[in-house]
């Protein structure tokens, strides 16, 4: 199959860019963008490679994505080696095919076609690419955004190429994401012999009523754009492994995916009040990995919906479900942010794949979005 989108995707897949190692992917993208007149600024932080590229001036549409991928798992379980792209029955297999090297290829090819047809486009077209999205995300998009904000860089619209679709490309568009707040909680007790509980203070027993009440809380109601806030306990650890020793500490880690109905400070206050109510001795550490954000109907959402309807003849659902993405950092710049990418059914899985025709379709959608906003 000869297609510039597929060929570029295959070239990217062949580079085993396990997060945060870029493995040469960005050099490939930069070469293509510079060839059509983009100015490229490398913005590396620690072990992470990033770049910000732009062409033109004025109202700015940026395409954002990541070159890094998650580990492939057991390579012997793949139908072909995970970093050797293969097409079978119209499906392109390889780690990163859907998340998100296919989107990157579609973006770049769309830009090449757009510039060829609109060499003097009136707005500014930009790219924000990182090699640290799948792992810590500490030195990737967030650092680039901070640097751009420090110099008052303009960003009006941003399309993130995360795999948003469920069954066919464009059936779901993400116009927002929930916030994510993690609590690392240690309940302190006194270690002792199980036969002499009066000489010890078992933190598991002490914390049980607190945890029971915590999981029963209804944090908020859903609203027009977001599902109700959810809380899930992710990890619990206590004890020495011996059956005759009561633990001295209980560690509990739980995560909130919260809507715009709440703030992280409201959640923290409610948890701390509950800890005090149960008279627990505790140490707590919070990690806010992202605030909720929402892009209402406007020029970007309308352009994305128009592109999907034009090429796939379906009306996309606008959803805010799922995990976090780098869109949460970009939204801080005041930009309208939307995610549109391929079908996500196999992301992070053995035999990750994407319909090759979907990537061709995605490139056309991206180009039409460019034409509506910055031509």
UniProtKB/Swiss-Prot annotation:
Its EC number is 3.5.1.18. The keyword Metal-binding applies. SUPFAM superfamilies: Bacterial exopeptidase dimerisation domain, Zn-dependent exopeptidases. Binds 2 Zn(2+) or Co(2+) ions per subunit. Pathway: Amino-acid biosynthesis; L-lysine biosynthesis via DAP pathway; LL-2,6-diaminopimelate from (S)-tetrahydrodipicolinate (succinylase route): step 3/3. Its cofactor is Zn(2+); Co(2+). Zn(2+) 1 binds at residues 66, 99, 162. Catalyzes the hydrolysis of N-succinyl-L,L-diaminopimelic acid (SDAP), forming succinate and LL-2,6-diaminopimelate (DAP), an intermediate involved in the bacterial biosynthesis of lysine and meso-diaminopimelic acid, an essential component of bacterial cell walls. HAMAP family: DapE. Belongs to the peptidase M20A family. DapE subfamily. This is Succinyl-diaminopimelate desuccinylase. It comes from Shigella dysenteriae serotype 1 (strain Sd197). The lineage of its organism: Bacteria, Pseudomonadati, Pseudomonadota, Gammaproteobacteria, Enterobacterales.
